[in-house]
A protein has these predicted regions:
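Sec-exported extracytoplasmic/periplasmic mature domains
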Residues: 90-102, 116-120, 137-145, 159, ...
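Short, flexible active-site loop motifs that bind/organize anionic cofactors or intermediates
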Residues: 80, 144, 217
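Noncatalytic regulatory segments and standalone regulatory/sensor domains
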Residues: 7, 34-41, 50-51, 174, ...
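Active-site-adjacent structural segments surrounding the nucleophilic cysteine of cysteine proteases
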Residues: 2-130, 170-172, 177-181, 203, ...
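Extracytoplasmic
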Residues: 64, 80, 161, 191-195, ...
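Proline-rich low-complexity regions
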Residues: 68, 74, 161-163, 212
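Stable alpha-helical elements in mature extracytoplasmic
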Residues: 81, 86-93, 128-136, 150-154, ...
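Predominantly the structural core of cysteine protease catalytic domains
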Residues: 122-195, 199-201
């Protein structure tokens, strides 16, 4: 918890409380209007049989969590930030859990400081998803769970107010804004291992991403099958990072058995 007490990066020490449910509206440039349907954040109960930790029986038709965004190179220094997607993903989720529900971009200097701090905490340059959870637990004080990436499980966790961190291979996402997408599609060195944040799903059954790997990764919509392809592509191309079709959730923790 000592690391968690030091973790503030412009937010100050913020008490973790339930995120109030509500409906909000926002625009991203010339893109479609996004409706933020924000459920209460449910802590992860260390007592796994606790009813408070169970997902709702009737899922909302759409959930979009108000998670702030940063790229992994907030100052534009992409050449030096090729391996900081884990940091950027953790930073976005951590700020959301601590009460930053701005949905816009995190201040670039603040984001850069946060990324540098998490880099200092990482045990290796590239992390497997369980290691990302361990960093969040040790230094940020969050409970962590790695879960199978089924369509239902992803929606259930989002309905509990929890963003998802997912490992993928970049070109598998189908986002043509990625370098080399049109000329070197899924070639080694162009399509690379990557982590991003799933912040919601919409009424058309698309999932919504905060993807730190490109400047145009904020609010990217992707179908479930496409996302699974990107996960499978990571599994095949980077066996050292192979965790299968899974995602990571972070949240405050409680223990109802005490």
């Amino acid at each position: 918890m000592l690391g968690a007490l030091k973790w503030f990066f412009g937010l100050g020490l913020v008490a973790v409380i339930g995120i109030s449910a509500g409906v909000y509206f926002a625009f991203f440039g010339a893109g479609p209007q996004i409706t933020y349907v924000t459920p209460d954040l449910v802590p992860i109960d260390l007592n796994t049989a606790a009813p408070s930790d169970r997902p709702p029986v009737n899922l909302p038709t759409a959930v979009v969590l108000r998670v702030p965004f940063t790229t992994q190179a907030p100052l534009g220094n992409w050449a030096d930030r090729q391996h900081t997607c884990e940091e950027a993903s953790l930073l976005m989720v951590d700020r959301y859990l601590r009460g930053d529900h701005s949905t816009g971009k995190i201040d670039a200097q603040t984001a850069d400081r946060g990324i540098n701090q998490i880099t200092a905490w990482k045990p290796a340059v590239d992390l497997e998803i369980h290691q990302i959870g361990a960093v969040a637990k040790k230094y940020m004080g969050w409970a962590d769970e790695v879960m199978p990436a089924t369509r239902l499980a992803m929606k259930q966790q989002l309905a509990l107010g929890r963003p998802l961190i997912v490992g993928v291979r970049t070109h598998g996402l189908g986002n043509a804004n990625y370098p080399g997408f049109r000329t070197h599609f899924e070639d080694t060195g162009w399509s690379v291992s990557h982590y991003l944040v799933v912040v919601g799903y919409d009424t058309s059954d698309s999932f919504i991403l905060n993807d730190p790997g490109i400047s145009k990764g904020h609010g990217w919509h992707i179908k479930y099958d496409q996302l699974m392809h990107a996960i499978d592509d990571l599994v095949h191309a980077y066996p050292n990072l192979n965790a299968g079709r899974v995602f990571l959730v972070l949240a405050p923790f409680t223990n109802s058995s005490k």
